[in-house]
């Protein structure tokens, strides 16, 4: 087996192929309110299938609201309202 040298490789595309539209923070436009750690249905929007907290680039939240959501999710996990991890996800 031979390896390709750096000069023979195809150049990688730089950046996204199409511009992404900016995500809007649902809390700043009044669509959602961070009410309480007991609102599990709202908190599940910000958790992945495996139980991880989604990053800002996926949720579109501002830094302030992302910190607040993270703390609220962690409180709900400690009170056993949300799981720390989900069971094995099969596709």
UniProtKB/Swiss-Prot annotation:
What is the protein's species of origin?
Answer: Deinococcus geothermalis (strain DSM 11300 / CIP 105573 / AG-3a)
Instruction: Give an example GO cellular component term for this record.
Output: cytosolic small ribosomal subunit
Protein name in UniProt: Small ribosomal subunit protein bS18
How is the subunit organization of this protein annotated in UniProt?
Part of the 30S ribosomal subunit. Forms a tight heterodimer with protein bS6.
Gene name for this UniProt entry: rpsR
Outline the segment boundaries, as ranges, of region: Disordered.
1-27
One Pfam family matching this protein: Ribosomal_S18
**Which terms in the Gene Ontology molecular function aspect does this entry carry?**
small ribosomal subunit rRNA binding; structural constituent of ribosome
- Family assignment? Belongs to the bacterial ribosomal protein bS18 family.
């Amino acid at each position: 087996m031979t390896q390709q040298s750096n000069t023979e490789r195809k150049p990688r595309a730089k950046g996204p192929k199409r511009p992404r539209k900016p995500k809007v923070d649902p809390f700043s436009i009044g669509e959602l309110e961070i009410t309480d750690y007991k609102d599990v249905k709202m908190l599940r929007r910000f958790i992945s299938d495996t139980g991880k907290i989604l990053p800002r680039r996926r949720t579109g939240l501002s830094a302030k609201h992302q910190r607040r959501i993270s703390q609220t999710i962690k409180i709900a996990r400690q009170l056993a309202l949300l799981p720390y991890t989900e069971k094995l996800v099969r596709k």
